[in-house]
Amino acid sequence: MAKINEEQVRHVAHLARLAVTDEEVQQFTVQLEKILGFAEQLNELDTTGIEPTTHVLDLKNVLRKDEVRPSLPRTEVERLAPDWEDGQVRVPAVFE
């Protein structure tokens, strides 16, 4: 059975920017081990003769034809943007 430790849970929580308590880390460690155990049961299935799939339903993406259409004038975009710098919209940093 797959093992997951508290350090791994803390690492994933950090990546997801989640603040977790020591109690939550212990709880999530147990829960994630159970989830991984259920997923490992799939390895026991005999899939001989079954074609691999990426989607359960055979759905197709419907795309429209690209058409050139007028957009907002640059002056309007500048007026609507919260911050503008060197000809580009300035946004808050996403990554540290």
Swiss-Prot record:
It is an enzyme of class 6 (ligase). The keyword Protein biosynthesis applies. GO terms for biological process: glutaminyl-tRNAGln biosynthesis via transamidation; regulation of translational fidelity; translation. SUPFAM superfamilies: Glu-tRNAGln amidotransferase C subunit. Gene3D superfamilies: Glu-tRNAGln amidotransferase C subunit, N-terminal domain. Its EC number is 6.3.5.-. It comes from the Bacteria. The keyword rRNA-binding does not apply. GO terms for molecular function: asparaginyl-tRNA synthase (glutamine-hydrolyzing) activity; ATP binding; glutaminyl-tRNA synthase (glutamine-hydrolyzing) activity. Belongs to the GatC family. Allows the formation of correctly charged Asn-tRNA(Asn) or Gln-tRNA(Gln) through the transamidation of misacylated Asp-tRNA(Asn) or Glu-tRNA(Gln) in organisms which lack either or both of asparaginyl-tRNA or glutaminyl-tRNA synthetases. The reaction takes place in the presence of glutamine and ATP through an activated phospho-Asp-tRNA(Asn) or phospho-Glu-tRNA(Gln). Heterotrimer of A, B and C subunits. PANTHER family: GLUTAMYL-TRNA(GLN) AMIDOTRANSFERASE SUBUNIT C, MITOCHONDRIAL (PTHR15004:SF0). This is Aspartyl/glutamyl-tRNA(Asn/Gln) amidotransferase subunit C. The lineage of its organism: Bacteria, Bacillati, Bacillota, Bacilli, Bacillales.
